[in-house]
Amino acid sequence: MNKLNPLKFGIIGCSRIAKKSVIPAILKSEFAELEMIGSRTNDKAKEFSNEFNCKKNGTYDDVISDDSINVIYISTPIGTHEELAIKAACAGKHVYCEKSSTDSFTSAKKMVECSKNNNVRIMEGFMFRFHPQHQKVKELINNKKIGNIDSFNG
């Protein structure tokens, strides 16, 4: 059996979700490697790199232009997502963008068209549907263990 080459991730944005969820998941996966961390400030990029034993760090553009990276995880403020996702796609990188990926249909359309034109994938980071805590809540609801549901916002 052939072993798949791991996806080499570049992180753009040193957010809490990157720190607590995404980077630990990358480090645990046999199918992914943490290649580089980028931030607006060198100090923050170095801090995250040291914490996660990542050898490379730099700016957002450094991450996008690094030839060893094939997937970019974007975890920055929503107003930066379109520009960063398009730059990454134009550089031939797949994009995993934290939710919400954009605040407009026009912006989303540009991001998707760019990824199609560059033969890369783009995905929004909405992954809670099958999270164990949500599955447990679903089980409790289905087994009528928590009473009647009058409304739900999720």
Regions found by a protein language model. Name each.
Residues 60-63, 101-103:
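Short, acidic/turn-prone active-site loops that include or flank metal/cofactor-
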